[in-house]
């Protein structure tokens, strides 16, 4: 018997490939099912295949960079993201139209690009670089922690502020990511408690103003459609006609999920019309088409991905802090998107236009998610190489 055991290529990460493949199938089949109502035609599922193929190319390209190179690129990617948000803000409506009350997309012909989706990945990369470079030996003082907090605030305030002007949902996602990365950075828990408490107080104050003083909320830049979404969520028993119209799509989503039962009605036998069924409410299509079993599979896949990310965070931290903190931010992104999207589909969270990552239709959302996934895949490959080197040395 040979004394040398054949080693598998470090580029083969079977569990991550499995996750990619399962989400690809779920996404394409669900979008195809949603198209049966004819509200989007029957071509969106084909476009989603193209988005996934482009994402696969992006993942492959990212594997040619080592983690140190990606960290160096984080500043440039972050700056490009900031500039794209500024250009979007000042662009005429001919190339940056207002859609559903928000000026969040560039439109060039039939192509639409949402810069805020890519900004989320750029923000995570930049924060991972800043946090990763702070006190790598673990010896820190209160002054060090405050200095790091100021750096994090300096990185986050501009993109979050620019996004908040038009898209409160995405801005909220970014703020959640920042808070999670701050919490995991090792900063003194007392400072974190102050920040978390201040954040909860601020959010509560904003919600209070939106619900009880909508005119005041509008005067400080909060959009009318955002106020309607919040009021329809918290005041279902005392709805105005406008609020009732806003909550109707949630009622339809709940009805669709309920009609699917245990095994679902199949992709060609959908009976409940759900608006935005390929994007915001794709989970309701899964529920009606594949029932409780289909919904459970989706949730289990997200738990599997999150578990894989948590394991990677722990194992790669001694080798590369940038990769570890990027995985922290990416995990936060997956968690909040999944919780918010599924939550609004079952009526426990307000409608915010947040897609179900990996599953919802959309070029910007799918590509940015897969770019982040590519960096995670790269980190997993590099970890395999590190451990193989240590084992064989």
UniProtKB/Swiss-Prot annotation:
Enzyme class: transferase
Signals that turn on the gene: Induced by the ECF sigma factor SigM.
Membrane-crossing segments per the record: 17-37, 45-65, 75-95, 111-131, 146-166, 169-189, 191-211, 285-305, 316-336, 342-362, 363-383
Gene that this polypeptide is encoded by: rodA
Function: Peptidoglycan polymerase that is essential for cell wall elongation. Also required for the maintenance of the rod cell shape.
Organism: Bacillus subtilis (strain 168)
The keyword Transmembrane is annotated on this UniProt entry: yes
InterPro entries registered for this protein in UniProt: Cell_cycle_FtsW-rel_CS (IPR018365), FtsW/RodA (IPR001182), RodA/MrdB (IPR011923)
GO molecular function: lipid-linked peptidoglycan transporter activity; peptidoglycan glycosyltransferase activity
Cell location: Cell membrane
Keywords (A to Z) from UniProt: Cell membrane, Cell shape, Cell wall biogenesis/degradation, Glycosyltransferase, Membrane, Peptidoglycan synthesis, Transferase, Transmembrane, Transmembrane helix
GO cellular component: cell division site; plasma membrane
EC number(s) given by UniProt: 2.4.99.28
Stated name of the protein: Peptidoglycan glycosyltransferase RodA
Biochemical pathway: Cell wall biogenesis; peptidoglycan biosynthesis
Catalytic activity: [GlcNAc-(1->4)-Mur2Ac(oyl-L-Ala-gamma-D-Glu-L-Lys-D-Ala-D-Ala)](n)-di-trans,octa-cis-undecaprenyl diphosphate + beta-D-GlcNAc-(1->4)-Mur2Ac(oyl-L-Ala-gamma-D-Glu-L-Lys-D-Ala-D-Ala)-di-trans,octa-cis-undecaprenyl diphosphate = [GlcNAc-(1->4)-Mur2Ac(oyl-L-Ala-gamma-D-Glu-L-Lys-D-Ala-D-Ala)](n+1)-di-trans,octa-cis-undecaprenyl diphosphate + di-trans,octa-cis-undecaprenyl diphosphate + H(+)
Family per similarity comment: Belongs to the SEDS family. MrdB/RodA subfamily.
Biological process annotations from GO: cell division; cell wall organization; peptidoglycan biosynthetic process; regulation of cell shape
Miscellaneous comment in the UniProt entry for this protein: Increased expression mediated by SigM is both necessary and sufficient to confer intrinsic resistance to moenomycin and viability to cells lacking aPBPs.
Protein's membrane topology: Multi-pass membrane protein
């Amino acid at each position: 018997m040979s004394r040398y055991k054949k080693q598998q290529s470090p580029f083969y990460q079977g569990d991550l490939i499995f996750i990619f493949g399962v989400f690809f199938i779920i996404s394409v089949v669900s979008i195809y099912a949603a198209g049966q109502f004819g509200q989007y035609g029957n071509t969106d599922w084909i476009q989603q295949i193209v988005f996934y193929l482009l994402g696969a190319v992006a993942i492959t390209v990212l594997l040619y960079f080592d983690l140190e190179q990606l960290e160096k690129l984080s500043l440039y990617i972050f700056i490009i993201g900031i500039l794209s948000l500024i250009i979007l803000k000042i662009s005429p409506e001919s190339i940056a139209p207002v859609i559903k009350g928000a000026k969040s997309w560039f439109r060039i012909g039939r192509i639409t690009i949402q810069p805020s989706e890519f900004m989320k990945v750029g923000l995570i990369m930049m924060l991972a670089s800043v946090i990763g470079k702070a006190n790598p030996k673990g010896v820190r003082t209160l002054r060090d922690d405050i200095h790091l907090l100021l750096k994090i605030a300096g990185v986050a305030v501009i993109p979050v502020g620019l996004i908040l002007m038009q898209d409160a949902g995405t801005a909220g996602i970014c703020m959640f990511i920042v808070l999670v990365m701050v919490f995991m950075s090792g900063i003194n828990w007392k400072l974190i408690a102050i920040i978390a408490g201040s954040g909860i107080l601020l959010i509560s104050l904003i919600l209070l103003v939106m619900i009880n003083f909508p005119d005041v909320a509008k005067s400080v830049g909060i959009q009318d459609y955002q106020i309607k979404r919040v009021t329809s969520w918290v005041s279902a028993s005392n709805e105005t006609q406008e609020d009732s119209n806003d909550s109707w799509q949630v009622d339809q989503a709940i009805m669709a999920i309920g009609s699917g039962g245990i095994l679902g009605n199949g992709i060609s036998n959908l009976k409940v019309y759900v608006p935005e069924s390929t994007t915001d409410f794709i989970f309701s299509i899964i529920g009606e088409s594949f029932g409780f079993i289909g919904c459970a599979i989706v949730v289990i896949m997200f738990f599997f991905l999150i578990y894989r990310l948590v394991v990677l965070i722990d194992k790669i931290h001694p080798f590369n802090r940038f990769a570890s903190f990027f995985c922290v931010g990416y995990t936060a992104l997956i968690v909040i998107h999944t919780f918010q999207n599924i939550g609004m589909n079952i009526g426990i969270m307000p409608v915010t236009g947040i897609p179900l990552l990996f599953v919802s239709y959309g070029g910007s959302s799918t590509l940015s998610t897969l770019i982040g996934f590519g960096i995670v895949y790269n980190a997993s490959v590099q970890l395999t190489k590190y451990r193989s080197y240590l084992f064989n040395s």
